[in-house]
Amino acid sequence: MHTRAIYPGTFDPITNGHVDLIERAAKLFKHVTIGIAANPSKQPRFTLEERVELVNRVTAHLDNVDVVGFSGLLVDFAKEQKASVLVRGLRAVSDFEYEFQLANMNRRLSPDLESVFLTPAEENSFISSTLVKEVALHGGDVSQFVHPEVAAALAAKLTSINT
């Protein structure tokens, strides 16, 4: 029985689509660790510490979820966390090929680590952190795509960058 899962990502920022998947994963597994990747190649707007804090605030209502920042190989992080399942989201068919390659690589590196794919609710299927940042950068209202605390943090971040 798989009791511990990891939902990895950059979460820059966490969106309603992410939260939807986290809430559903929390119903499927005894414990879910949200692994926030340092991933310097993505040049995130928020620091790792800021992303961990935002995700902690947005998921505080889930007793069986914790949030941990990490760097390095995901399979190593999964071993450290004693997780046997990776949860990944698929928004569209276009996500599948990349996720399929990742799942196969992770299986090769760690044969006991299973990948489970969840699809978001229809109203969240088009939301991505990249699109949210783009809308916010151009002054658009992102409140329907992210938690209010995330919207405020994003507005503050963009204000500090533009001043």
From Swiss-Prot:
GO terms for cellular component: cytoplasm. Homohexamer. It catalyses: (R)-4'-phosphopantetheine + ATP + H(+) = 3'-dephospho-CoA + diphosphate. CDD domains: PPAT. This is Phosphopantetheine adenylyltransferase. Its cofactor is Mg(2+). Pathway: Cofactor biosynthesis; coenzyme A biosynthesis; CoA from (R)-pantothenate: step 4/5. ATP binds at residues 10-11, 18, 89-91, 99, 124-130. It comes from Shewanella putrefaciens (strain CN-32 / ATCC BAA-453). Its EC number is 2.7.7.3. Belongs to the bacterial CoaD family. The gene is coaD. The record marks 18 as: Transition state stabilizer. GO terms for biological process: coenzyme A biosynthetic process. GO terms for molecular function: ATP binding; pantetheine-phosphate adenylyltransferase activity. NCBIfam families: coaD_prev_kdtB, cyt_tran_rel. Reversibly transfers an adenylyl group from ATP to 4'-phosphopantetheine, yielding dephospho-CoA (dPCoA) and pyrophosphate. It is an enzyme of class 2 (transferase). Substrate binds at residues 10, 42, 74, 88. Keywords: ATP-binding, Coenzyme A biosynthesis, Cytoplasm, Magnesium, Nucleotide-binding, Nucleotidyltransferase, Transferase. It is found in: Cytoplasm.
